[in-house]
């Protein structure tokens, strides 16, 4: 029985599910599902539609099931510069604000104000 591995790549304009397995000592990759993505304006902020992304991730996994190719593991890669704040019950607080939102202007310069020593002092447990 084949062992399948699912990689989900979520980019700024689209996402895709790539299913891989080994065949005759070589890795075989197959695109299973593709979906659109993009920032939206919501409450005056540029945000990601987290609900739509979650549904797209599930839809691609369901496609694997339809094909009878159930992955033994799943990895998800994103642009990795955005965040969502959670409350004490792990519920979202507000929108998933995108890195291109106006609130991030000048942040790279602000980050340079902290030397590695100062950052260590701030983050040390």
Predicted regions and their residues:
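N-terminal glycine/serine-rich phosphate-binding loop of ATP-dependent small-molecule kinases
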Residues: 1-95
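Single conserved hydrophobic/aromatic residue that forms the stacking wall/gate
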Residues: 114-125
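Residues that scaffold the ATP/ADP-binding catalytic core of kinase and kinase-like folds
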Residues: 95, 107, 125
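Short, glycine/acidic-enriched loop or turn micro-motifs at the edges of active sites
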Residues: 12, 104, 120
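Active-site core segments that coordinate phosphate-bearing ligands/cofactors
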Residues: 2, 6-7, 19, 105, ...
């Amino acid at each position: 029985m084949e062992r399948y591995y699912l990689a989900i790549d979520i980019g700024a304009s689209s996402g895709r599910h790539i299913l891989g397995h080994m065949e005759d000592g070589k890795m075989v990759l197959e695109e299973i599902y593709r979906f659109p993505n993009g920032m939206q304006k919501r409450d005056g902020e540029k945000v990601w539609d987290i609900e739509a992304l979650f549904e797209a991730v599930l839809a691609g996994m369901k496609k694997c099931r339809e094909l009878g190719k159930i992955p033994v593991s799943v990895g998800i890669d994103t642009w990795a510069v955005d965040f969502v704040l959670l409350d004490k019950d792990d519920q979202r607080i507000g929108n998933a604000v995108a890195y291109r939102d106006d609130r991030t202007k000048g942040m790279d310069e602000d980050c340079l104000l902290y030397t590695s020593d100062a950052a260590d002092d701030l983050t040390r447990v």
